[in-house]
């Protein structure tokens, strides 16, 4: 439709639609018409493609056919779920007027706006994943970033210092919807994301943001939240809060504070590290064979979501980590017993968010009641546990006897889905409601009596009394007996084989019954809102309890996992280093059919780098990753897959493991590898754990070897990070002879004829050979190709042994440390623009003599 179309050229109904659509130009408008939600014009075309629904036409308005698409009202939630998964938003427009009394189109208004980041309805949410709305701000000083989980009220801000840190935050939080200012410059950072929303600059204004936040929290300033000077973050938070208010159209009492996330509080992991360690998503984008898949047996959705947050934000505070370790140890004997009532608590966190938004459904209140009923048993089980952190959490879990009593008296045992269906409020809760219900419920008895009386009085054996949703109450008589009905029977409807009538007595009763049903439903809706009013003052204590219950679920889950998977409690030390005895990869050991070979690891100030050699498939990458995962689990407060582990201070974990072309950004495999390597060399510290796997393999042999050598040298001598450096460049195994703190280890294999057996056991010293051809044969490379490769290998090894350029003397690697020839030095010092022709000729002869 053209923007300059005049409203008065359209039908009254389309005028109403266009006025509503003008208020929501950028999102799909679902316009209620009878039993359908209809979409028109460009919305209809978009919805047809997005939802795979038929595109039709509805008459004409302003002289043109109107494109139209629609979905049944009872299926709307399914279609909305599909839209939000695609990053789309929708406005839901309902009929609020009475068609019987309306002159012209029935009055309609938009009653809710559904966006990917602001949904709270359980039908639209993934129950075991956070669903975040985020806002981003950027200027010369850096980035501001805010996230809100509206389904829990969790509001966080951060100020990433640079592009790489911001990219890592986006990857960690993975928002469903992202608000950004219209002048945002680094679009490459976000342009590939779903759910992008461009916002005007004024929505990020700092003073307005502070005013909005203080108003929301009921404070005079933001000093108490520690964010008063976080101006970049506050700009993002202000825009985010305004957007939520605009879309939700209600107060947000469950959003009661703001938390500043600071990098120094946790172990920093960049986007590549999170991806390579496969914490919650595998390299194929799925959730199978990830750390979360093994570790998460939480019995509540809110516990599962909390555990995933812990996985992505390992912390450094030894006091908090020790509290968690002690709690896990204290819960091991009762974990299974505790999980029984916890399972019945369900997703209390999201139920409370819907209560705060006044969108909680009857079954939410029934689930809340059921959760309250579990609290005494949880208290009984935990009171004997003499662990401070467990008792602290238990003190936050209230026992809401009065609220439980309210819900037991007010809500029926198994309520319907919606309040408008009626039958939500229990009998005996309200006398007036009971009276109106009695009148409505007595209809069946009355109709039975009327049917018997009229049938006997008139002698019509086909006569029966019934009710139809369109025509109301009726007396039906077969066509063959219809000529016998008395004159006061007024025909209401004609069927193929029968006639339907109404009589004054039945009409009077119909009015009374319909009035009583309407009255009962109106009273019920009012009482339902009153229950909200009685529950909402307790929201802060309820949220505190839900959070404590979620953490108890996580800790009980980790206790069960430690017992089941034979994990041990790591020692957290303030002395630098990592010492692991019998370490195992938590995921690989669960998917392997044969027993997993455990391995030790020692890193210390005197042993800062391990050069790891050995065959492909020998277990180098597994050994490296398991070290990172053990360190990460220790910084959750979890037990770890090892016989024993002592973990010193860690500030960052870096992984340069594997790579693939980044086609979307036009970057080759080697470019991706070098970008990740550069990030490590710029940001790693002495307290960082660095995994470097096969650096330099994406280019020529000499280039690759040179880069690998220089990177290893830099990490070992300048940065002094704790490094696991896997390589196939055997020249690097001479590094320990030249540098302190560098040690060779290897994973071995045994060849027998043309077969190979991988030992998967880490040994001190360098590997003796690479076994590349044996692995190729194992992979199914044709025998004649393997045979030819063996011949060629012998030729190359013979050439290599005779070539001076490939030798490495005892003090230096000539390939990398050759002196610059005098002729080259002379050329570098020469300024050709200052030479006369004669001088240039003299220089040519001089250089020739140097060569």
Curated annotation (Swiss-Prot):
ATP binds at residues 614-621. GO terms for cellular component: cytosol. The keyword ATP-binding applies. The keyword Nucleotide-binding applies. GO terms for molecular function: ATP binding; ATP-dependent DNA damage sensor activity; damaged DNA binding; mismatched DNA binding. Keywords: ATP-binding, DNA damage, DNA repair, DNA-binding, Nucleotide-binding. Pfam families: MutS_I, MutS_II, MutS_III, MutS_IV, MutS_V. HAMAP family: MutS. Belongs to the DNA mismatch repair MutS family. This protein is involved in the repair of mismatches in DNA. It is possible that it carries out the mismatch recognition step. This protein has a weak ATPase activity. This is DNA mismatch repair protein MutS.
């Amino acid at each position: 439709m053209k923007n300059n179309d005049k409203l008065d050229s359209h039908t009254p109904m389309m005028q109403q639609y266009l006025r509503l659509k003008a208020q929501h130009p950028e999102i799909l408008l679902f316009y209620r018409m009878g039993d359908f939600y209809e979409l028109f014009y460009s919305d209809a075309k978009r919805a047809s493609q997005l939802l795979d629904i038929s595109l039709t036409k509805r008459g004409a308005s302003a002289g043109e056919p109107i494109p139209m698409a629609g979905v049944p009202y009872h299926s709307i939630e399914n279609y909305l779920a599909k839209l939000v998964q695609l990053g789309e938003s929708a406005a839901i427009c309902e009929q609020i007027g009475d068609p019987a009394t309306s002159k012209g189109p029935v009055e309609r208004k938009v009653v809710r706006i559904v966006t990917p980041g602001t949904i709270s309805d359980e039908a639209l949410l993934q129950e075991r994943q956070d669903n975040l709305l985020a806002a981003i701000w950027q200027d010369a000083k850096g980035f501001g970033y805010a996230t809100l989980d509206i389904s829990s009220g969790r509001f966080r801000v951060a100020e990433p210092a640079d592009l790489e840190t911001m990219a890592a935050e986006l990857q960690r939080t993975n928002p469903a919807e992202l608000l950004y200012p219209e002048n945002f410059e680094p679009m490459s950072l976000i342009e590939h994301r779903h759910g992008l929303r461009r916002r005007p600059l004024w929505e990020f204004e700092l003073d307005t943001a502070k005013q909005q936040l203080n108003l929301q929290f009921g404070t005079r300033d933001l000093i108490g939240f520690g964010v008063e000077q976080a101006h970049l973050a506050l700009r993002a938070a202000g825009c985010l809060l305004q957007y939520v208010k605009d879309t939700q159209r209600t107060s947000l009492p469950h959003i009661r504070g703001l938390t500043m996330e600071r990098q120094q509080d946790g172990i920093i992991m960049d986007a590549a590290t999170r991806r390579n360690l496969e914490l919650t998503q595998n390299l194929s984008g799925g959730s199978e064979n990830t750390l979360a898949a093994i570790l998460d047996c939480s019995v509540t959705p809110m516990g599962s979501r909390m555990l995933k947050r812990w996985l992505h934000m390992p912390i450094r505070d030894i006091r908090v980590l020790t509290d968690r370790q002690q709690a896990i140890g204290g819960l091991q004997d009762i974990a299974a017993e505790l999980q029984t009532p916890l399972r019945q608590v369900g997703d209390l966190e999201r139920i409370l968010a819907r209560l705060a938004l006044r969108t909680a459904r009857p079954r939410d209140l029934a689930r809340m009641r059921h959760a309250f009923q579990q609290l005494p048993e949880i208290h009984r089980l935990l009171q004997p546990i003499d662990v401070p952190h467990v008792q602290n959490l238990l003190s936050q879990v209230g026992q809401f006897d009065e609220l439980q009593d309210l819900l037991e008296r007010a809500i029926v045992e198994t309520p319907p889905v919606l309040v408008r269906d009626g039958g939500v409020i229990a009998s005996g809760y309200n006398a007036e409601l009971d009276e109106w219900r009695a009148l409505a419920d007595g209809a069946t008895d009355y109709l039975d009596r009327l049917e018997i009386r009229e049938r006997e009085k008139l002698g019509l054996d086909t006569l029966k009394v019934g009710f139809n949703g369109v025509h109301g109450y009726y007396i039906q008589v077969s066509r063959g007996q219809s000529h016998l009905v008395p004159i006061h029977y007024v025909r209401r409807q004609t069927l193929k084989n029968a006639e339907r009538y109404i009589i004054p007595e039945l009409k009077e009763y119909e009015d009374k019954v319909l009035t009583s049903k309407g009255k009962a439903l109106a009273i019920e809706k009012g009482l339902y809102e009153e229950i909200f009013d009685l529950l909402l003052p307790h929201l802060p204590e309820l949220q505190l309890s839900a959070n404590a219950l979620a953490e108890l679920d996580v800790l009980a889950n980790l206790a069960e996992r430690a017992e089941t998977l034979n994990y041990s409690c790591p020692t957290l030390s303030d002395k630098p280093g990592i010492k692991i005895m019998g370490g195992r990869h938590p995921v690989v050991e669960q998917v392997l059919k044969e027993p997993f070979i455990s391995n030790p690891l020692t890193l210390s100030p005197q042993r800062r780098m391990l050069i790891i050699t050995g065959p492909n498939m020998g277990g180098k990458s597994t050994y490296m990753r398991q070290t990172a995962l053990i360190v990460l689990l220790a910084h959750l407060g979890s037990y770890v897959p090892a016989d024993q582990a002592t973990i010193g201070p860690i500030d960052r974990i870096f992984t340069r493991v594997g790579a693939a072309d980044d086609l979307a950004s036009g970057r080759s495999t080697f470019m991706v590898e070098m970008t990740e390597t550069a990030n490590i060399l710029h940001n790693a510290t002495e307290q960082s754990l660095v995994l470097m796997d096969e650096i330099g393999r994406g280019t020529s042999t000499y280039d690759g070897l040179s880069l690998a050598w220089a990177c290893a040298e830099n990490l070992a001598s300048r940065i002094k990070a704790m490094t696991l450096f896997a390589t196939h460049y055997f020249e690097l195994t001479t590094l320990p002879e030249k540098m302190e703190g560098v040690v060779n280890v290897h994973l071995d294999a045994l060849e027998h004829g043309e077969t190979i057996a991988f030992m998967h056991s880490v040994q001190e010293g360098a590997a003796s050979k690479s076994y590349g051809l044996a692995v190729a044969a194992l992979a199914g490379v044709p025998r004649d190709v393997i045979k030819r490769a063996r011949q060629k290998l012998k030729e190359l090894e013979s050439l290599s042994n005779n070539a001076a350029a490939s030798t490495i003397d005892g003090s230096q690697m000539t390939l990398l440390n050759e002196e610059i020839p005098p002729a080259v030095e002379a050329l570098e010092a020469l300024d050709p623009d200052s030479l006369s022709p004669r001088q240039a000729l003299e220089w040519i002869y001089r250089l020739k003599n140097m060569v």
